[in-house]
A protein has these predicted regions:
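Amphipathic alpha-helical polymerization modules
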Residues: 1-142
């Protein structure tokens, strides 16, 4: 009876685990963006928090011969800040304008939901692979 290559289970787990790790990093950055969405600069006329964007990269795991996903660079979004006229705000410049972060919480929440779904998909792969491995072991034992 041929049970396939046991390394196939390891490969599946390796790819899914790399996806889990990448999505955790993505969710961390998105959470940071949301947490800072209403912050202002520490000094009058200064720049507030700037939205961060995560990139991913694909790397070859030479020991297994599979591509895994890695958290790439974390870049800053260069789009304009939101400017509100609030002369009484301590962060206001000489004209009474306050810069707010270039974070759109609706976009961040959408990205967060997407990251959660990707995380869940990778977790389902880990769970299914573990079950298949356990069934294979049970068949071999009997």
């Amino acid at each position: 009876m041929d049970f396939g290559n046991p390394l196939d289970f390891v490969k599946s787990l390796t790819v899914a685990a790399s996806g889990l790790k990448a999505q955790i990093g993505r969710m961390r950055i998105i959470s940071e963006n949301i947490a800072n969405s209403d912050s202002v600069a520490a000094t009058p006329g200064g720049d507030p928090y700037r939205r961060k964007i995560v990139t991913f990269s694909s790397e070859l795991d030479r020991s297994l011969g599979v591509n895994v996903v890695k958290l790439g660079t974390v870049e800053t979004d260069k789009s304009d800040f939101l400017i509100k006229h609030e002369p009484g705000n301590p962060a206001a410049d000489a004209n009474g304008d306050v810069k707010y972060p270039n974070v759109n919480t609706l976009i961040e929440m959408t990205d967060l939901r997407d990251a959660q779904r990707s995380y869940e998909a990778n977790l389902n792969v880990v769970t299914a692979t573990r079950r298949m491995l356990q069934r294979t072991i049970d068949i071999i034992k009997s």
